[in-house]
Amino acid sequence: MNKNKREKEFYSVDVGDSTFTVLKRYQNLRPIGSGAQGIVCSAYDHNLERNVAIKKLSRPFQNQTHAKRAYRELVLMKYVNHKNIICLLNVFTSQKTLDEFQDVYLVMELMDANLCQVIQMELDHERLSYLLYQMLCGIKHLHSAGIIHRDLKPSNIVVKSDCTLKILDFGLARTAATGLLMTPYVVTRYYRAPEVILGMGYQANVDIWSVGCILAEMVRHKILFPGRDYIDQWNKVIEQLGTPTQEFMMKLNQSVRTYVENRPRYTGYSFEKLFPDVLFPADSEHNKLKASQARDLLSKMLVIDASKRISVEEALQHPYINVWYDPAEVEAPPPVITDKQLDEREHTVEEWKELIYKEVLDWEERMKNGAIRGQPSPLGAAVINGSPQPSSSSSINDVSSMSTEPTVASDTDSSLEASAGPLSCCR
């Protein structure tokens, strides 16, 4: 595309303290969130005739860490396609050459709220269970491709008013390697698993601990382990769950084990004490959707020793979850990530920049050739035709699917923040 023609396709608009230079198909830009990794606007896409979210990555080439994170997020979003994962609709830059290349824009589905807002609502068991089911379906899809999200938290999980749920933000997601000691500083502190806090390395069910913390927060309407730092976070965990066994202690390196063993010992509380019936909604007409089953699921997710913690596959078979089980959603074909060295690769900033530029050009070429039409495929659709709609009844058949919206970036990631009001289906 020649320079003049490309320039005519874009226009610039100030959004807060930033300038967005976007394709003219995107109009009515309005800021909805910002954070360490990006600024997010809602916009109207005249080509698709729908509202979308546009995320401008903040200074993606300022250092190797930012550049690698931007590359990882873009590659994973391009290839992951599931109804419970946020759908990438477009990728573009206004710059015309690699030398000029500085800005990356990701266009995604626009959702109505993030889970931070939903947590404050009184949900019945149907909605609570169904939200968890969709969360686990999305995580299972990632895990099936060897991808651990590593940053699950309420602001990274978004919903639509029809109760469709989607998972956001792959800036910190990485491919898994059995036995690999992975980087300890990842997820927002409150949702960090013990193995992360203690620098033990981790595997896929590190995401299950985060889901357990989120479920507990939805039940209690407050953060389960609100630690101020690593040490306080660990103390918050053992004060409630109890000091772990000697078997677990022996898995720690010597210096960490010495510290942990010298802390006061706690017996912890039973899950009946931590999550009494009064915190839960009234039992559903469905005999599996009741406080005792939700509490049992919590007790299997919030296990300090990861080797004894439930897996995502096991969680999906739990009675509180499997009432929704649909093989098409749970067993969707895994994404094919062509770059198997996604995490092991190390490059200079300029090399990362060139790789990202090639990914953007590849997207543009596929769009031009009709391989991408700017619409999510059926598995990535925001609303699935024929999905059940929630009503005032508490019957198991009354809850619909869910969807997401960009959320504000946290202190460790590039998530987006929703600006919309509460879910009508959860009122």
Swiss-Prot record:
The modification Phosphothreonine is found at residue 183. Dually phosphorylated on Thr-183 and Tyr-185, which activates the enzyme. SMART domains: S_TKc. The keyword Kinase applies. Expressed in brain and ovary. Its cofactor is Mg(2+). Residues 404-417 have a biased composition (Polar residues). InterPro entries: Kinase-like_dom_sf, MAP_kinase, MAP_kinase_CS, MAPK_JNK, Prot_kinase_dom, Ser/Thr_kinase_AS. The keyword S-adenosyl-L-methionine does not apply. One of its GO terms (biological process) is rhythmic process. GO terms for molecular function: ATP binding; MAP kinase activity; protein serine kinase activity; protein serine/threonine kinase activity. The TXY motif contains the threonine and tyrosine residues whose phosphorylation activates the MAP kinases. This is Mitogen-activated protein kinase 8A. The lineage of its organism: Eukaryota, Metazoa, Chordata, Craniata, Vertebrata.
